[in-house]
Amino acid sequence: MLATPGALHHLLLLPPPPHTQLAFHHAVGGVPAALLPLPRPRRVAASASTSRRGGARRRAAGARVRASVGEEAPPVVTEEASTSGGPTKFSTKIPVGDRHILVETGHIGRQASASVMVTDGETIVYSSVCLADTPNDPSDFFPMSVHYQERLSAAGRTSGGFFKREGRAKDHEVLVCRLIDRPLRPTMPKGFYYETQILSWVFSYDGIHSPDSLAITAAGVAMALSEVPNKQTIAGVRVGMINDQFVVNPTTEQMDDSELDLVMAGTDSAILMIEGYCDFLTEEKLLQAVETGQGAIREICKAIDGLVQKCGKKKMFDAIDLPPPELYRHVEDISGDELVKALQIKEKILRRKALSALEEKVITILSEQGYVAKDESSGVSENLADVIEEEDEDEVIVDGEVDEGEVHIKPVSRKPPRQLFSEVDVKLVFKEVSSKFLRRRIVEGGKRSDGRSPCELRPINSQCGLLPRAHGSALFTRGETQALAVVTLGDYQMAQRIDNLVDTEESKSFYLQYTFPPSSVGEVGRIGAPNRREIGHGMLAERALEPILPPEEDFPYTIRVESTITESNGSSSMASVCGGCLALQDAGVPIKFPVAGIAMGLVLDTLEFGGDGKPLILSDITGAEDASGDMDFKVAGNENGISAFQMDIKVVGITLPIMEHALLQARDGRKHILNEMSKCSPPPAKVLSPYAPLIHVMKVKPNKVNLIIGSGGKTIKSIIEETGVDAIDTGDDGTVKITARDLSSLEKSKAIIANLTMVPKVGEIYRNCEIKTIAPYGAFVEIAPGREGLCHISELSSSWLAKAEDAFKVGDRIDVKLIEINDKGQLRLSSRALLPDANQESSSKQQAGGSTREKAPQKDNLVKMTTRRPRRKKQAEASTAENNATASPKDLASQGSEMGTE
């Protein structure tokens, strides 16, 4: 067998020849095809020769070459050597927006392949990259995992629950993991199968500078410094728009006033990922925001490249293991016309079965021809050069010349060997060839797999009110993608509570939960807690719908939307947006206007497939077009603006002109979808379901809230119990929310609360009031449900009374007048003031100087009161306490609902 110069120098531990370095340079520049002419190293499972730390593998000695960083000099990299013989720290300050971020490495996490600390203000994110010692089996998916965690200690907090240690990742942390993963994955070369793990922790958080965009940059720096042979450096920023001005990496306070929340990542020359939401910004404004962010990313990447040149590790380009070029030719020759016919099948399941059968046929034919063999121990391909006959063990190739030395590296065959391929290689190549054929069909023929043109959308139909007991429901179908959306309305108790670094009591009154069961694609799979994809798609749809919701003051409901994907063939998250919008209308939610979502695709290199070289944008992509294309760009909004967006790509970046073309084409698609949604049959009900709860909001004076709650919540519990409402929620600002299942109980509770919190005025007269309690010194009269006052015995009648019970009993009704409100808010009432002879009798008594008959009893009573004072004092205290706590409301008086609150 002929050993190539690059492979031979690798085995002899010599520097590779110049042309080998040139091939690596192109790979770094984003052209992995330049690696194809180089033979892949032989795979041997778990052997020392493939161990990264075993010493037998020699990495390429060529220096890492990156894209041009422009004319401006990058920020200075500072090297700080420890005076005590400790590790050397490298650091650089990078200008971002109106401030600098600090990147440090070399002094912490030294056993990782690379680790960095990135600081913005007092927010610090630590990221590390580690690789496995041996490669995984070949696959079409780069084995990379990302983990991000926000330590509560970063904000000086500890979990309030029983378990103090951080555990399962929160939804917000999962979303940040996806933000880190998605821009890094396109920069990884095909054929690199070493499992890679990125760990990121927030170690310090100042509540001002957000850690999520910082974590993207930290992971990008760590990856650039590590041995992973990524193609280009990436960085991430956040862009906000405040007062029509774009701000890079705005503070949390600035974001409160921002109309845009854009998180993006890219290289020094292209965009890799964008995600965010806005208040129906135009396409032009969004493009300006992306351009602003790209400028900041460019400067960060320049600085990172300078740091890599100073302290970066050599890249493992020699570990890239690609299928041999001959295999592509064999697969294309065998599949040929049958592959073209299979790709023309419109139905997804039938097409998948046809492609699977064709793949097996290709493997069978190659096996019969002697091209496919499987090593039983490792499942990797073997080369017949190891057992070639007529070999001369003394003859080897060194730098293209014969050397007859004693070093025996590889035998040289006098006959060209037949290459053996593994089944895994055949499957990988078949997938690539299928993708290539599909792209060629779209570019050359102008027709996609289902017969549509590039700008054409799939058929759309929708219907509402499928589920009679649900508060709102809709079924949205677009081609072979279908979403069943259900809306549930509730009170504050249904809100989604969030535990974050700063605010432990934050909650969401609107949230969308996305479910993607395996049955939606006709498969058998795992069922359980939502995975990262489901969390990410749900958040995207939630952000798309949130701007159209009415303010909480107008619609005080907690809204939960569930989107279950019943069929899937591309852009199921955008189907969730459309179905969710219809379900909201069906539930009677007064949305501002309808929204829709669409997924856009891309074939970037059309020249390769017979096109004119211009990028081809596809509207409403299917699953196959997503997998075979170069972009998945989801855009949601209405005819005039965008509410949410998310872009992932599979190539090393796209430019702003391509993005502009995609956004404008997406706007046309949204208009078409909204028009189709307006034809929904049956249409949305647009009224509250009879099964939805009723919520009424009242405003009372803040100092009256305690009257509603009562001692230990006694009063509010009694109102709920006796009126039958579901819940009563009070706020410190005087807001009272009543949730009930029927109007009758709602009106009862409204009347009770209105009377409890009313502000009585001296001189007001209350008619037909019930005596609730009789005491020796007077009677307690209920002037309104739950509000009582004391009518002293001297104010009960114009005649003298020895005991109140002599003339009145509990349950009697009298008219009273409010004559005094003391400092404690207690009411003093008088019935005598309303009697016709009250004023005349009082005047005659004053003129006579008082009668003897009245004085004697007063003296006798004084003695009696002296002997009974302790008992009467207790009674008075008990009555006062009862007055403060208010009586339990029972039957509502008609006057109760008429009394207003202030």
UniProtKB/Swiss-Prot annotation:
Region (Disordered): 44-93, 833-902
Record's compositionally biased regions (Polar residues): 80-91, 839-850
CDD domains attached to this UniProt entry: KH-I_PNPase, RNase_PH_PNPase_2, S1_PNPase
Keyword tags: Chloroplast, Exonuclease, Hydrolase, mRNA processing, Nuclease, Nucleotidyltransferase, Plastid, RNA-binding, rRNA processing, Transferase, Transit peptide, tRNA processing
Disulfide-bond pairs as recorded: none
Cited InterPro entries: ExoRNase_PH_dom1, ExoRNase_PH_dom2, ExoRNase_PH_dom2_sf, KH_dom, KH_dom_type_1, KH_dom_type_1_sf, NA-bd_OB-fold, PNPase
GO cellular component: chloroplast; cytosol; mitochondrion
Organism superkingdom: Eukaryota
Subcellular location: Plastid, Chloroplast
Location (main, coarse): plastid
Compositional bias per record (Low complexity), positions renumbered to this chain: 44-53, 877-888
Transit peptide: 1-66
GO BP terms: mitochondrial mRNA catabolic process; mitochondrial RNA 3'-end processing; mRNA processing; rRNA processing; tRNA processing
Domain S1 motif: 763-832
EC number: 2.7.7.8
Catalytic reaction(s) noted: RNA(n+1) + phosphate = RNA(n) + a ribonucleoside 5'-diphosphate
GO MF term set: 3'-5'-RNA exonuclease activity; polyribonucleotide nucleotidyltransferase activity; RNA binding
Enzyme class: transferase
Compositional bias ranges of the Basic and acidic residues kind: 852-862
Domain KH: residue ranges: 693-753
Function: Involved in the metabolism of all major classes of plastid RNAs. Required for efficient 3'-end processing of mRNAs and 3'-end maturation of rRNA transcripts, but is not sufficient to mediate their degradation. Mediates tRNA degradation. May function as a poly(A) mRNA 3'-5' degrading phosphorylase.
Family of this protein: Belongs to the polyribonucleotide nucleotidyltransferase family.
Protein name as it appears in the record: Probable polyribonucleotide nucleotidyltransferase 1, chloroplastic
Lineage: Eukaryota, Viridiplantae, Streptophyta, Embryophyta, Tracheophyta
